[in-house]
Regions:
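A structural "hinge/loop" feature
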Residues: 1-4, 29, 79-91, 120, ...
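N-terminal lobe/hinge region of extracytoplasmic solute-binding protein
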Residues: 1-13, 41, 118
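Short capping/connector residues at structural and topological boundaries
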Residues: 5, 9, 84, 147-148, ...
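Extracytoplasmic/periplasmic substrate-binding proteins
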Residues: 92-96, 110, 138-139, 146
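Short aromatic-glycine motifs in intrinsically disordered, low-complexity regions
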Residues: 106-116
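Short structured motifs
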Residues: 2-6, 53-57, 120-122
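Extracytoplasmic/periplasmic ligand-capture domains
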Residues: 13-16, 20-51, 59-62, 114, ...
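Surface-exposed binding/hinge segments that line
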Residues: 9, 18, 52-102
Length: 213
């Protein structure tokens, strides 16, 4: 289901996107083409982790408040798929908080956006302590609430590095959900009342290359 972009069309020199109207950021600011242009230009910055994914984009053009065009330096039929990794920021919020450019991980920089955010999604970030706890609460003004009704009002995300400790927290009821439980623990989890496991096939290939030279 399309989200911030409702439709998109290809042309010889790029892609044109029609943006969803009526979307607001968590602080109430309107989502417009200006935010999309800002976010893509930010993603192209040298310190950005996403610059390789959008490197074929040579320019971002505003057609109107809810239409933008990504001009590419050549044909790129899979660009829309790549764009799912580029997150749209509120340009006004970013400028007000001095995060017009991405943080520089190589220089161990930490900016305001490391612990704060202002998105458009169903959950609002209330607090974040990296490697400790992130707390999110339901966004009462989310544009997609009628299409994707949910039943969760608050999320507490606690990173637990040790797999055994993570599974123990699940079995004791300390946490409600864990990602990627160890294979050897799946049967024990499935045998516990109130717990279920979900598995999916991974979309990847693993190969061994033999040096025959």
């Amino acid at each position: 289901v399309p989200e911030l972009a409702e439709s998109w069309t290809a042309s010889p020199d790029g892609w044109t996107f029609k943006l969803r109207k009526g979307v607001t950021f968590h602080d109430g600011a309107d989502f417009t083409a200006e935010d999309v242009v800002f976010s893509f230009n930010r993603a192209l910055e040298e310190s950005s982790d996403y610059k390789e994914q959008v490197k074929t984009v040579s320019k971002v053009e505003v057609i109107d408040d809810y239409t933008i065009k990504l001009v590419t330096d050549g044909a790129n039929p899979i660009l829309p798929n790549t764009l799912t990794n580029v997150y749209i920021m509120d340009s006004g919020w970013a400028k007000a908080n001095g995060v017009e450019k991405p943080q520089d991980f190589a220089a161990e920089e930490e900016t305001f956006s490391v612990r704060n955010s202002n998105g458009t999604g169903p959950f609002m970030l209330m607090s974040r302590a990296p490697e400790e706890l992130s707390v999110l609460e339901r966004n009462p003004n989310w544009w997609g609430d009628s299409m994707f009704p949910g039943n969760v009002d608050r999320i507490e995300y606690r990173p637990i590095k040790n797999a055994a400790t993570r599974v123990a927290a699940l079995l004791s009821g300390e946490v409600d959900f864990v990602l990627d439980a160890p294979l050897q623990d799946l049967k024990r989890i499935e045998a516990t009342d109130g717990l279920t496991t979900k598995t999916v096939a991974q979309v990847r290939s693993i190969f061994f290359g033999m040096d025959q030279g």
